[in-house]
Curated annotation (Swiss-Prot):
Organism in which the protein naturally occurs: Vibrio campbellii (strain ATCC BAA-1116)
Stored PANTHER family: 3-ISOPROPYLMALATE DEHYDRATASE, HOMOACONITASE, MITOCHONDRIAL-RELATED
Gene name linked to the record: leuC
Official protein name in the record: 3-isopropylmalate dehydratase large subunit
Pathway: Amino-acid biosynthesis; L-leucine biosynthesis; L-leucine from 3-methyl-2-oxobutanoate: step 2/4
Cysteine pairings via disulfide bonds: none
Keyword 4Fe-4S found: yes
Length: 466
């Protein structure tokens, strides 16, 4: 019987398979940041252990960093302690660190792919739930907890049960203006925020393979938001072209040999999935979340749903609670509500193509007077590229704030956050209660939709812009 892409990568990494036990997988890459690593390094220190494979471990600072200054004190004492501790730990254990002053610093899931650290067929872990991003390369990538971070640091392995498999196929081509973010939000709207629980998802279909690597990263980034353990997309020529020539990618004949192997990383024709979900790309419109989980999402031209429209009593109760928290009225349009803040950034949408998409909307226009709009590139490399293209000038002339790289307003762990009841159009991945600040109201959208909301002062359908 044939194997799925996930099964091929999983099986290739089984180091120990004792009877009656979950297999132990070898881990090819371990990405580390300042928030989930301090206790893991403490554990090594207490037990007198070293980092097993320093050459496969890469650290950066992203969650706590200020986006207005490189001053390590700017985000408060706890942030300073976490960043200083990461510096100390990386120096002591010999781990490569891209700190806040390094030219490669950035959000861990932006930094890894752009440097060629992320490669097809690998197992990749990080103490961060959105590690699934790297699955866009056909790698098995997933988030782990701090005790598991310690285990990988010490052994370069991890005990990991085999997951069920789900195929999500997006058939046909999307309409003009529809982005990867719209595709993945539409998928989560279809599956719900728990529909992928217990599964590793493979995304496929023409609408997926048409995406650039950056678009594919956006899709896989949000696999966790439908409850999945990880999300993968089979590598192809788009993947190989992206990887070629990057800092840590194979070079010359090694690259050619790697590509030959990478070409085998696809689901066999006769392979069986445990579940299959199908969407028609032509049906996907610009998406906006209305509730407090990413599955509570509608097309921008749809009315806000009424709780009684949900047959499931749990979903109905969830909708009632979400509408109350979000300050929304069923039946109205989301465009009836002003936004207070706009955030273009996060590991979902802070790469150069995201910057370009937002700049295209911003060019020659002005941010509404009541809106604060932040553009936060995902890394120093993205920032430099955007500035070389003059995108920062476009944003600043339009009234957007051009910031330094970091996780920023995706989560309220630094100075970029919402005040109580402030409404935000955000390109991030989570719209949970309080995610962007206490009592903050988050609506997830694409970079183009976010930029358009900043200018109009409320949500608009980008298909209707001049």
């Amino acid at each position: 019987m044939g194997k799925t892409l996930y099964e091929k990568v999983y099986d290739a990494h089984v180091a120990v398979a004792a009877e009656g036990e979950n297999p132990i997988l070898y881990i090819d890459r371990h990405l580390v940041h300042e928030v989930t690593s301090p206790q893991a390094f403490d554990g090594l220190r207490e037990k007198g252990r070293k980092v097993r494979q320093v050459s496969k471990t890469f650290a950066t600072m992203d969650h706590n960093v200020s986006t207005t200054t490189k001053d390590i004190n700017a985000s408060g004492e706890m942030a300073r302690i976490q960043m200083e501790t990461l510096s100390k730990n990386c120096e002591e254990f010999g781990v490569t660190l891209y700190d806040i002053n390094h030219k490669y610093q950035g959000i861990v899931h932006v930094m890894g792919p752009e440097l060629g650290i992320t490669l097809p067929g690998m197992t990749i872990v990080c103490g961060d739930s959105h590690t699934a991003t790297h699955g866009a390369f056909g790698s098995l990538a997933f988030g782990i907890g701090t005790s598991e971070v310690e285990h990988v640091l010490a052994t370069q392995t991890l005990k990991q049960a085999r997951a069920k498999t789900m195929k999500i196929e997006v058939k046909g081509k999307v309409a003009p203006g529809i982005t990867a973010k719209d595709i993945v939000l539409a998928i989560i709207g279809e599956t719900t925020a728990a529909g992928g629980t217990g599964y590793v998802v493979e995304f496929c279909g023409e609408a997926i393979t048409d995406l650039s690597m950056e678009g594919r990263m956006t899709v896989c980034n949000m696999a966790i938001e439908l409850g999945a353990k990880a999300g993968l997309i089979a590598p192809d020529e788009t993947t190989f072209e992206y990887i070629k020539g990057r800092k840590f990618s194979p070079q010359g004949s090694d690259f050619d040999a790697a590509v030959e192997y990478w070409k085998t990383l696809k689901t066999d024709d006769e392979a069986q999935f445990d579940a299959v979900v199908t969407l028609n790309a032509a049906d996907i419109k610009p998406q906006v979340t209305w509730g407090t989980n990413p599955g509570q999402v509608i097309a921008v031209d749809q009315p806000i749903p009424a709780p009684e429209s949900f047959a499931d009593p749990v979903e109905k109760a969830s909708a009632e609670k979400a509408l109350a928290y979000m300050g929304l009225e069923a039946g109205k349009s989301l465009s009836d509500y002003n936004v207070d803040k706009v955030f273009v950034g996060s590991c979902t949408n802070s790469r150069i193509e995201d910057m370009r998409a937002a700049a295209e909307i911003a060019k020659g226009r002005k941010v509404a007077s009541h809106v604060q709009a932040l553009i936060v590139p995902g890394s120093e490399q993205v920032k430099a590229q955007a500035e070389a293209e003059g995108l920062d000038v476009i944003f600043k002339e339009a009234g957007f704030e051009w910031r330094l790289p970091g996780c920023s307003m995706c989560l309220a762990m630094n100075n970029d956050r919402l005040g109580p009841h402030e409404r935000c159009a955000s390109t991030s991945n989570r719209n949970f209660e309080g995610r962007q600040g206490r009592d903050g109201r988050t609506h997830l959208v694409s970079p183009a939709m976010a930029a358009a909301a900043a200018i109009a002062g409320h949500f608009v359908d980008i298909r209707e812009l001049d």
